[in-house]
């Protein structure tokens, strides 16, 4: 695979919702380590300075955020489905049936699907109304809250 395409894929698929940008930051630092002096600080700012002739140094500021919109686990229901809240601007109707990843407390990614109540179970009002996050859950294939705890999925 073309290295430029691979780089785009790696950065596009890196896990980085707000507050959890470490994977993106590490990827960026690794990507430029041969051409830049790199360090970060306690506020998760990353600094990259081209390795070059200090006498002819030009300073350029590239200001960008590393985080992406995401979700945070709110609760694990007794049936094993997961209630969640948005991090950033989401339209709930656009994520139904979408694949998501949950980062557990061991740093493992658990695959899930955003699910809603089947249309034939909805009231007339809900069927024709807008979708809210309260109407959605994440299904990771667990049959109970205990199973999700065994997967080390926790809520905030």
Model-inferred region functions:
Residues 1-156:
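N-terminal hydrophobic/helix-forming segments and targeting peptides
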């Amino acid at each position: 695979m073309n290295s430029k395409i691979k780089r785009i894929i790696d950065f596009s698929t890196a896990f980085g919702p707000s507050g959890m940008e470490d994977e993106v930051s590490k990827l960026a630092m690794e990507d430029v380590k041969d051409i830049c002096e790199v360090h970060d600080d306690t506020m998760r700012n990353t600094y990259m300075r081209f390795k070059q002739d200090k006498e002819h140094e030009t300073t350029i500021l590239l200001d960008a955020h590393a985080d992406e919109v995401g979700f945070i686990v709110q609760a694990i229901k007794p049936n094993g489905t997961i209630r969640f809240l948005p991090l950033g601007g989401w339209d709930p109707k656009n994520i139904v049936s979408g694949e998501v990843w949950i980062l557990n407390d061991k740093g493992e990614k658990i695959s899930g699907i955003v699910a809603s109540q089947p249309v034939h179970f909805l009231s007339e009002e809900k069927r024709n109304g807008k979708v809210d996050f309260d109407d959605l859950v994440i299904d990771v294939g667990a049959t109970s809250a205990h199973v999700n705890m065994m997967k080390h999925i926790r809520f905030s």
